[in-house]
Design a protein with these regions (language model features):
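Intrinsically disordered, low-complexity regions enriched in Pro/Ser/Thr/Gly and acidic residues
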Residues: 98-126
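Amphipathic alpha-helical segments that mediate coupling or scaffolding at interfaces
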Residues: 21-24, 44
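Acidic, glycine-anchored loop motifs typical of Ca2+
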Residues: 50, 140-147
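Short, glycine/small-hydrophobic-rich surface segments
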Residues: 41-109
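Low-complexity, S/T/G/P-rich flexible repeat/linker segments used as non-globular hinges
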Residues: 147-175
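N-terminal single-pass transmembrane signal-anchor helix
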Residues: 1-22
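Membrane-proximal amphipathic alpha-helices
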Residues: 23-34
Length: 175
């Protein structure tokens, strides 16, 4: 009888451990994607743009660096698309803002595999010290309408360099 009880306890613990392991592997998608997105923000910011397309001989113009403007839509655009399931995005989802060279199109960021998370990008300002960005991944792995949130932020410092947060903010990561 004691053996049956011990086996029952061990199987319960094993089921819990496997569930935690599976949830952790799914959250890896959000962590990796946000890291890639933060790198894309830095690369886009460091890409210098001239204010004038053609310069006359003997003249100069200022080079500008700017954060990509905010994305107008998340991918996917509603949390119901990722509630307890995966979403297969299309290139059109990521290029919604291509006409204005903003959002994910400006970052040249896409995910071509099925995804558990809804991604968004927001910029606060463009090129001055203190201007910042936030990249967010929201998920609903168990389909209970309660979203998990992963965020990474960065800001332009006084030397006009982007400082990216060393850690992700994670709220209810296994939700």
């Amino acid at each position: 009888m004691i053996v049956v009880v011990i086996i029952g306890i061990l199987s319960t613990l094993a089921a819990y451990g496997v569930r935690k392991y599976i949830a952790n592997t799914k959250t890896t998608e959000a962590r990796n994607a946000l890291g890639r997105m933060a790198s894309a923000v830095v690369i886009a910011f460091e890409h210098e743009n001239m204010a004038s397309p053609v310069l006359g001989q003997g003249t100069s113009t200022a080079l500008t660096r700017a954060l990509c403007k905010s994305a107008t839509k998340s991918v996917p655009n509603a949390p119901t698309a990722i509630a307890g399931r995966k979403y297969q995005s299309s290139l059109a989802d990521w290029n919604t803002d291509a006409a204005t060279n903003s959002g994910f199109a400006c970052l040249q960021f896409t995910i071509d595999q099925p995804q558990y998370y809804m991604y968004s990008y927001a910029a606060n300002g463009a090129s001055q010290p203190g201007d910042s960005f936030t990249a967010t991944a929201n998920g609903d792995l168990n389909g209970d309408q309660a979203l998990s949130t992963f965020q990474i932020t960065g800001a332009i410092n006084s030397s006009y360099v982007i400082n990216v947060a060393p850690n992700l903010l994670e709220v209810s990561p296994e939700e």
